[in-house]
Amino acid sequence: MNFRDNSNIEYRKLDAPLKFINKNYITIGDKDREKYSKILADILEAFRRKMAESDEVYKTFEGAVHYTGSAYDKVKVGKPDEFDLNIVMKLPAAWDYHNDIEVKNSSPSYVTINVKSGCERSYRDPSFLNKYQKGIRIWTDNEGYFIQEQFHAWMEGVVKKALNKFPSHGLEYIIQTNGHAIYVKTKKSGPAVTLQCESQDRKIKIDVDLVPVIQFNNNSSTLWLSPPVRQRPLLCCKKTWCAVPKPKKNNGFTNKNREWRVSFTDQERDLLYNKGRIKNLIRQIKKLKSVHEETKSLPSYYVKTIFLWALDDKSLDQNMWTQWSDGALFMFMLKRLHSHLDENKIPYYWDSRCNLLDALGYAVNNMKYKIQRIIKEIDNSLDNPEVLAKYLLTADEFADFRRRYGSIEEGFESLSIDSAPPVSDLRGDSRCCIL
């Protein structure tokens, strides 16, 4: 059934339960956000100070900490207890991006970085040999290429040296923040070093992923990658982008350790800014996928990417994010997710040669059929809010919904079909259909 054959008015029946679910089970409260953010800031301040004390190379190249991920995009579901932080390393300010640094596209969504020319032109900064040479030597091979494995191993060493400056108890390190003790352990996860933090009473737990990155466009000269990497959208005022030491398996590239994943988190934040209810929608789809075993392994970034492509779709009326009803938007994007799974394709937004779903293998089929069943049942039960709730909530949350929603449903009378404001016709593209 094609999505645009559905009645726009019918999907408004989902508005009230969606608003209730958003408020009670998805949206993070301001108090929780402030509490966890304050704890994170205290941990980070103490930890970065020890990192700078522990390693001269880190102190020399240290840039700002770049907050990334769901928590700071405001699309996090549940407690704000997981944070992604880019630990930015800035290249020498005297280097010119066009003459001293050679960045080339390699495998889809990856680049190589060569700084041999910059090292040879060190006369631009008389103190270069003393100030920068040690770090450059640690991070590069004998041909001047940055090597992600060396860079990542170096950062792990910095983290370990910094932690060793704190008191320890067993396998945990103790960071004192404003009179409170935070117990910290570490683990490796992809390109990140994760700090697993707990309060002394074990009531608060926070995971902090520290990802070391090399930042570009942080000085007077600028460098953007050549096609097929997407050029910087006009809406994006920020020019900085990062190279991430993220390993890529089976890419056929001879020197894969020279490859770095490109990351454009600043631009993605610009693209999602002030786009109506789009962040609510991202949270809803993420909530749904997190509840079901078949879809749990779909990374949240892939969900975000689907929305970036929808914003880029010229066949859509982009006023939809403010004019359509909550129910219509939710079902449209759920069906769009199904279309991507059905085609087994979610292209990386910045380099469409890279299909993100390739990393998931056969799990995509299970996801596709699960989403298809959910769509069919919701479409057939628009008058029953419990069907929608069943697919968006955990068992305990659903039991709570059943107890509470019926007694307050009258409070949503202002959202009834007759009183709801007119909404634009649903115009999905031809891909958004369920077969």
UniProtKB/Swiss-Prot annotation:
Residues annotated for Mg(2+) binding in this entry: E82, D84, D209
Record keywords: ATP-binding, GTP-binding, Immunity, Innate immunity, Magnesium, Manganese, Metal-binding, Nucleotide-binding, Nucleotidyltransferase, Transferase, Zinc
Residues annotated for ATP binding in this entry: S70, E82, F83, D84, K286, S300, Y301, Y302, V303, K304
GO molecular function terms attached to this record: 2',3'-cyclic GMP-AMP synthase activity; ATP binding; GTP binding; metal ion binding
Binding site for Mn(2+): L311, D312, D317
Pfam families for the chain: Mab-21, Mab-21_C
GO process annotations (BP): innate immune response
Cofactors, names only: Mg(2+); Mn(2+)
Enzyme Commission number: 2.7.7.86
Residue sites binding GTP per the record: D209
Reactions that this protein is recorded to catalyse: GTP + ATP = 2',3'-cGAMP + 2 diphosphate; GTP + ATP = pppGp(2'-5')A + diphosphate; pppGp(2'-5')A = 2',3'-cGAMP + diphosphate
InterPro entries: Mab-21-like_nuc_Trfase (IPR046903), Mab-21_HhH/H2TH-like (IPR046906), MAB21L/cGLR (IPR024810)
Thylakoid is among the record's keywords: no
Similarity-based family: Belongs to the mab-21 family.
PANTHER family: CELL FATE DETERMINING PROTEIN MAB21-RELATED (PTHR10656), CYCLIC GMP-AMP SYNTHASE-LIKE PROTEIN-RELATED (PTHR10656:SF42)
Biological function: Nucleotidyltransferase that catalyzes the formation of cyclic GMP-AMP (2',3'-cGAMP) from ATP and GTP and plays a key role in innate immunity. Directly binds some unknown ligand, activating the nucleotidyltransferase activity, leading to synthesis of 2',3'-cGAMP, a second messenger that binds to and activates Sting, thereby triggering the immune response via activation of the NF-kappa-B transcription factor.
Protein name as it appears in the record: Cyclic GMP-AMP synthase-like receptor
Gene name as annotated: cGLR
